[in-house]
Amino acid sequence: MEKEKRLTKKEIFSMFIRSNFLLGSFNFERVQAMGYCYVMIPAIKKLYGPGAKRNEALQRHLEWFNTHPWLTAPIFGVTAAMEEEMANNKGIDGKAISGMKIGLMGPIAGVGDPIFWGTIRPVLAALGASLALGGNIAGPLLFFFLLNAIRLSTKYYGLKYGYVKGMEILQDLAGNRIQKLTEGASILGLFVMGALVSKWTTINIPIVVSRIKDESGKVDVQTVQNVLDSIMPGALPLGLTLLVAWMLRKGVNPLLIICGIFVIGILGYWAGFLA
């Protein structure tokens, strides 16, 4: 009886290392396809000898593919598990593998983009920038090391998880489990960003409303900013943040928003209604 072909930790680790170069051959014809095939080579070499089956496997992973680059890891793992079953004649064929990839890349992208691009990266960048603004070199280092620690952990453990779970991973994507995870991460990110906006954003309107001289002869000057702070501290930074968020939702180019803020700030200081 022929011995079953099994992937070892060596092939899994090699796939993990290669996954860091997924976008090295990014192109607009097949997007991540060449990188995907490159990652799968250690598993394919282990499971298939030289010949038609190996060639078919390589061609299978040159098909169009695009999803979140960090969360390709569990898809790599599932693909490796299915290729292993196919190599051992367990009833899996090439169409099933391709179908699985197509079926997972959409939901995975829907999870990865809001969690990593929309939450983790901005929050870490904000924390690093807050330290950097104070002249602390730990700011950029904190951002770099924490972000890459999360990236590498996601790739490594995601790959192992996908390989161990195989097609059972589809059950984890079912229901509203992923939706709850995404919503929770988004709420956490908004909470942190809200706190940082209050700390960073400074808007001062120095227009004088009144001058009152007390009994000692001291003049108490009230400005628009003093009045606003007495009603609701941080109202202007909050309003600016909500305005920018609304403009982004309406599809306004972020570069135009940034330039607009610069122009208003410079003109406001020159005209004397901002300080």
UniProtKB/Swiss-Prot annotation:
UniProt xrefs under PROSITE patterns: PTS_EIID (PS51108)
PTS EIID domain residues: 5-274
Topology with respect to the bilayer: Multi-pass membrane protein
Transmembrane segments: 100-120, 127-147, 187-207, 227-247, 255-275
Pfam family, one: EIID-AGA
Keyword Cytoplasm listed: no
Recorded coiled-coil stretches: none
Gene Ontology CC annotations of this record: plasma membrane
Subcellular location, record wording: Cell membrane
Keywords: Cell membrane, Membrane, Phosphotransferase system, Sugar transport, Transmembrane, Transmembrane helix, Transport
GO biological process, one term: phosphoenolpyruvate-dependent sugar phosphotransferase system
Function: The phosphoenolpyruvate-dependent sugar phosphotransferase system (PTS), a major carbohydrate active -transport system, catalyzes the phosphorylation of incoming sugar substrates concomitant with their translocation across the cell membrane. This system is involved in fructose transport.
NCBIfam families tied to this protein: EIID-AGA, PRK11103.1
Domain note: The EIID domain, with its homologous EIIC domain, forms the PTS system translocation channel and contains part of its specific substrate-binding site.
Name of the protein in question: Fructose permease IID component
Organism annotation: Bacillus subtilis (strain 168)
